[in-house]
Amino acid sequence: MSRKQLALFEPVLLVQALTDAVKKLSPRAQWRNPVMFVVWAGSVLTTLLTLAMVTGQIAGGALFTGIISLWLWFTVLFANFAEALAEGRSKAQANSLKGVKKTAFARRLRAPRHDAQADNVPAAELRKGDIVLVKAGDIIPCDGEVIEGGASVDESAITGESAPVIRESGGDFASVTGGTRILSDWLVIACSVNPGETFLDRMIAMVEGAQRRKTPNEIALTILLIALTIVFLLATATLWPFSAWGGNAVSVTVLVALLVCLIPTTIGGLLSAIGVAGMSRMLGANVIATSGRAVEAAGDVDVLLLDKTGTITLGNRQASDFIPARGVDERTLADAAQLASLADETPEGRSIVILAKQRFNLRERDVQSLHATFVPFTAQSRMSGINIDNRMIRKGSVDAIRRHVESNGGHFPADVEQNVENVARLGATPLVVVEGARVLGVIALKDIVKGGIKERFAQLRKMGIKTVMITGDNRLTAAAIAAEAGVDDFLAEATPEAKLALIRQYQAEGRLVAMTGDGTNDAPALAQADVAVAMNSGTQAAKEAGNMVDLDSNPTKLIEVVHIGKQMLMTRGSLTTFSIANDVAKYFAIIPAAFAATYPQLNALNVMGLHSPNSAILSAVIFNALIIIFLIPLALKGVSYKPLSASAMLRRNLWIYGLGGLVVPFIGIKVIDVLLTLLGLLGLA
């Protein structure tokens, strides 16, 4: 992936974020965040009190109240800045995507064939169902399916990957994305969406986050923060009559400062930024999530369904051995296998031809010169082969060849059955070769497990995530590869129906399931899964069924998606722990300062030895504002992620963010108090 990554603090983004932070000071914007709305209301109240004191309408220390008011406004601004900076990074990513959209004309065909009469129309006028012809050098005007032709397509504007890809009619590589460019040949495309509904439009809308909805965990946390705010608001309101009854009423300014320091302003100010940044990090991994809910669900996933080919193994199975049936020599088997593979352009087919050359110097022959007919592989027959004169040679799966042999009056040999089982036990895939009704032997196709994948699965297991390998191989082959790769379970001879049933089974047990897919046959399972990552190279049906799209079309990315989701949840939990813990230190600073005159016994709580009541209150308010700024990088980048069990992760975060949340404010407030004292700032010392 070559997409340019944004620096955490781009100067242009900082300037725009500062401007947006000021714009967010409106009551309507603040109302969306109840905790910060209370701080905003306190800022307005203390500002009005300052003006009243300056004009002599009420008695009181205008200077002290004014400074408190100023830092309360800073608290609101800093929270706005955190959110605006996160949104600005997302908008910058969206702007880069908008640059892909180009106003262009399209050749709309009057009939679904490339030689039909065409009308030049603006791309914006295309509707779902329209047929267009796109030639080399043209920008593809709409999302759609290729119904005729094949071409090399440059998708770098969408994926960031410079290497062109092949798009052609039929199969799982027929889906094209508007905004990409054809490099060679031509395509006839059936548009699958209306203007404004394209994949690119949905990417831009998601990234900009204008309609970003809060996720369930965000809503739950917001409710908790609101409840804490209400409790502290009521507690603060009751303190004034207590102090007045004691003969030394606490000022409204001090009560407002106390309330702001008590409520969880740190997480309240950073909560929205954490959610936006999580979506942005997902895009940084070249994965488009349709909503924050999908990113959050990725963090809660505890079952991963992983396709064997391309995810667990390298996906390029190679012929490794010819195992003849009893009474058949190996050269005869190799000759028949090569003939059956002459027109087979799959990596497996080419490797069979090459192995026959290497073993027996059987030179590759030409199908046309042999006057032969190639029989392609189909999902129904599960065989491919060649017809030469009266010879009918086939290669395919064991079950398919057995049915073929029996339907032609033959018998499937027991020794071949044993050879098939032996190959499968070694983790290779057996292909059986037959001529007419006579079974000639077995070809072993060896698939290589990716390096380091076993260690990654071990890390996932530590985190309580179960890994399940999905494969079309028979049970013996699947079991051998599963053992080699270190997955927890496997589903062999998988069909779309079997995958869907497995997902429903895990969900019925209360588990969250993640999977990848690229074909139309994957769509039902993708729609059922909690986290469904569709490949960008896959079909339109798969992309519409999933709640994420991997622009790199890399099935292994599913593991990274889970890591990003867990990091977002950990960041939110860690900063919530820190926010609530650091309130404790603020209690020790502000409560003795506010009530020591009325209740001298409270001086015992002044463990920090703060210089004066005014400097103690101001130090706590200043720290409360500055800590938001210091935590913005952590909120945007996410906390350090380590693959640990839930209990180990909880202990780690309590030590770092719980204990840290207790210690840091004691140090910070004391340092600010010392600075205020040394400066003799405004006589507050």
From Swiss-Prot:
Catalytic residues in the record: 307
Keywords, comma-separated and alphabetical: ATP-binding, Cell inner membrane, Cell membrane, Ion transport, Magnesium, Membrane, Metal-binding, Nucleotide-binding, Phosphoprotein, Potassium, Potassium transport, Translocase, Transmembrane, Transmembrane helix, Transport
GO cellular component, one term: plasma membrane
CDD domains named in the record: P-type_ATPase_K (cd02078)
Gene3D superfamilies referenced in this protein's UniProt entry, alphabetically: Calcium-transporting ATPase, cytoplasmic domain N (3.40.1110.10), Calcium-transporting ATPase, cytoplasmic transduction domain A (2.70.150.10), HAD superfamily/HAD-like (3.40.50.1000)
Localization (cell): Cell inner membrane
Binding annotation for Mg(2+): 518, 522
Chain residues that bind ATP: 344, 348, 377-384, 395
Reactions listed under catalytic activity: K(+)(out) + ATP + H2O = K(+)(in) + ADP + phosphate + H(+)
Highest taxon, organism lineage: Bacteria
Transmembrane domains' residue ranges: 34-54, 58-78, 219-239, 254-274, 588-608, 616-636, 662-682
Topology versus the membrane: Multi-pass membrane protein
InterPro entries: ATPase_P-typ_cyto_dom_N, ATPase_P-typ_P_site, ATPase_P-typ_TM_dom_sf, ATPase_P-typ_transduc_dom_A_sf, HAD-like_sf, HAD_sf, P-type_ATPase_bsu_IA, P_typ_ATPase
EC numbers on record: 7.2.2.6
A GO molecular-function annotation: ATP binding
Family: Belongs to the cation transport ATPase (P-type) (TC 3.A.3) family. Type IA subfamily.
Quaternary assembly: The system is composed of three essential subunits: KdpA, KdpB and KdpC.
Known function: Part of the high-affinity ATP-driven potassium transport (or Kdp) system, which catalyzes the hydrolysis of ATP coupled with the electrogenic transport of potassium into the cytoplasm. This subunit is responsible for energy coupling to the transport system and for the release of the potassium ions to the cytoplasm.
Annotated protein name in UniProt: Potassium-transporting ATPase ATP-binding subunit
